[in-house]
Amino acid sequence: MAESKKLIKNTTIYALGDIIPRLLSFVAFPVLTHYLTPTDYGILNYVNALSTFLMVVSFLCTNTYYLVYFYRCEDEIAQKKLLGNLSTFIIAYNLIIVLLLLLCGNYFFKLLDSKISFYPYIIIGILTNFFNIFSILPSALYRLLEKPLFLTMINISRGVITLVLTLILVVFFNYSALGVLYSLLILSIVYAIIFLFITQKFIIWNFNWKQIKEILIFSLPLVPGSLAYYITTISDRILIDKYLNLNDLGIYGTASTLALILNIFSYGAYKAFEPFIFKSWGEENFSYIFEKIRNNFVYVLLFGSLGLSLFSKEFFQIFSGVKFHGAYFYVPMIIIGVYCSSVKMLYGTVVTAKGKTKVNSGISIFGAIISVVLNISLLPSFGLVAAALVSSLVLAIECLILIWYAKLDIHRNTPILSFLVVCLVTFLFVYMINLENIFLSIVLKITVLTVTISILSKILSVNPFEIVKGFIKK
């Protein structure tokens, strides 16, 4: 019982460490949209997409090996040597990547027909990614040592300082997109030094090629699946830059910023449910337990999806510059994909519990191929609508495949019906019914939201008050 309470406590602290920095970055959104143009946002989205992709290439999923084999080390010395050996390899490997990109990157991006200058924007992104690698293994270490509070405080402090520095550079020094990128680079350097310092007593620097080969044999098969997932979710940004323009990319990125707020709902809820799923796996009543978890999870997701979609227009009208007001149109389309990705994450946990990790990778690779092909085919003709719907379609297909593969004996009609209800309400009150008076529009949508979530609670047999009470207790 005590162990269970400790697990819940640690999980909640980890979730806060991820959620609070995301909320802080969102706080800056209303300010930044008044000082940055859609083109500036397009540049930032492109660089962020590139950095996300580079992080997978930079680590080759070796951090997964570290998490799995840390406690299999024979003693504390072996644990310290594992961290030192892996850190030495990762730093040396990434220095080579940085040098190659500095030498050949400009030529490569010309082949992509990118509209973003390699110098200074892409260079800053590459350097930021390099210094960010210094935080990955230490973060994994502190999770293994079950010291969530310390790690969470570091993440929150980084989020606060990043927010302040970004606003100073953009608002007071008028650095526009460069201000955001400079703040990320500066903080990545500062926290690289901090992480090196705090891990000194847990590390013995060394290089053991034999062990590195064992690590790579374990981790490299995981890379295609990880890359495929990010290709599915971020390749649209790269292709929008190629086939459309930076202004469109900025509008799309702004819509995605609001839609991805749903991840805050899903991540917090999932982190609360995940340990219980693994703990209950194999029990006779697992299907019943999972169905109850799924219904609660779907309810939270649909509540967030509907709220973000309904009020997206009013949000941009109140909190963003006029140039970004049209972004609301794409929010509901993108949110479908975010919703499907979150549900997929839940069923992916079941597949992982079955020990079928290759299935997740195979589905992600399939989705990545479909996503790239459809975007290349449809973007030039249908623009941002194609980008939003292709991403959502692919993630929906991946989700359905995982649901089928999980092969759980549970009811599937209720979440489907709930999803269709939310889609219908969203279509009517975002695209069909528009009130010019913003106050009346907000009042109407609050009423619609309240009625709809009441209907969803009946369909899914969920008590929203119990969900809130459960999170408060945790």
List each model region and its residues.
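N-terminal membrane topogenesis motif
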Residues: 1-26, 77-84, 88, 149, ...
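Hydrophobic alpha-helical transmembrane segments
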Residues: 119, 123, 152-200, 256-259, ...
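Helix-loop junctions and terminal segments of transmembrane helices
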Residues: 29, 58-74, 144, 255, ...
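Alpha-helical transmembrane segments of polytopic membrane transporters and translocases
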Residues: 40-58, 183, 236-238, 248-267, ...
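Membrane-proximal transmembrane or re-entrant/amphipathic helices at the cytosolic face
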Residues: 431-474
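Interhelical loop/hinge segments that connect adjacent transmembrane helices in multipass membrane
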Residues: 1-3, 7, 177, 193-233, ...
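Signature of the first transmembrane helix
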Residues: 6-64, 94, 98-105, 128, ...
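Alpha-helical transmembrane segments of multi-pass membrane transport and lipid-handling proteins
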Residues: 85-113, 168, 266-269, 290-341, ...
